[in-house]
Amino acid sequence: MKYKLLPCLLAILLTGCDRTEVTLSFTPEMASFSNEFDFDPLRGPVKDFTQTLMDEQGEVTKRVSGTLSEEGCFDSLELLDLENNTLVALVLDANYYRDAETLEKRVRLQGKCQLAELPSAGVSWETDDNGFVIKASSKQMQMEYRYDDQGYPLGKTTTSNDKTLSVSATPSTDPIKKLDYTAVTLLNNQRVGNVKQSCEYDNHANPVDCQLIIVDEGVKPAVERVYTIKNTIDYY
């Protein structure tokens, strides 16, 4: 029997120090920020990350970079959108995120480090008892967000004037592969698009490389676009 145990003991000795305890849940801050700033949420003790979206020609179209504290607060967040020629860079300062260049107060926070208000746009956010942002509102629109039991964003519904835009996501049943998902977009209950994503994962159950297929069904014939997402993630 001891000979049968030997390979197991060797495996433990060789790998035990490198074993990673996988966190399957998403923090309220990570889930809510990913909703608002349009990036894939990550799990575990993330220190910093860069998420890059590339088109079929390998050209970068969007990039999101963030640094987080050990408590899971975003210390900084940078969003580059080359398709729309925009760049937003935010840094944490007490109860606000300031513009990294002008130091103007851009986003007011609530609780530990959760979104509360975007004064320049007249947008305010509401949270549930667990700290997840579940509603955003302004004079022009209302948005409601949905999450599963692990805090994974399941979509949102936006109402503005006489239009209702709803995005509903269905993640993989494998809790490790949460970022493998399909999603459907409805405009006034009419289907106008769908999305499918599949990824490779690291040992924290976070996506490293993903293929994202976006189909615009609002035009005839439908237009399909294929993107690649590259994630670079450092952990505490």
UniProtKB/Swiss-Prot annotation:
Keyword Lipoprotein attached: yes
Annotated lipid attachment (N-palmitoyl cysteine): C17
GO cellular-component term (any): plasma membrane
Record flagged with keyword Transferase: no
Coiled coil start-end: none
Membrane topology designation: Lipid-anchor
Sites of S-diacylglycerol cysteine lipidation: C17
Record's subcellular location: Cell membrane
Annotated PROSITE patterns: PROKAR_LIPOPROTEIN (PS51257)
Superkingdom in the source lineage: Bacteria
Signal sequence residues: 1-16
UniProt entry keywords in alphabetical sequence: Cell membrane, Lipoprotein, Membrane, Palmitate, Signal
Main location group: membrane
Family: Belongs to the UPF0257 family.
NCBIfam families reported for this sequence: PRK02939.1
Name of the protein in question: UPF0257 lipoprotein YnfC
Taxonomic source organism: Escherichia coli O127:H6 (strain E2348/69 / EPEC)
Gene label: ynfC
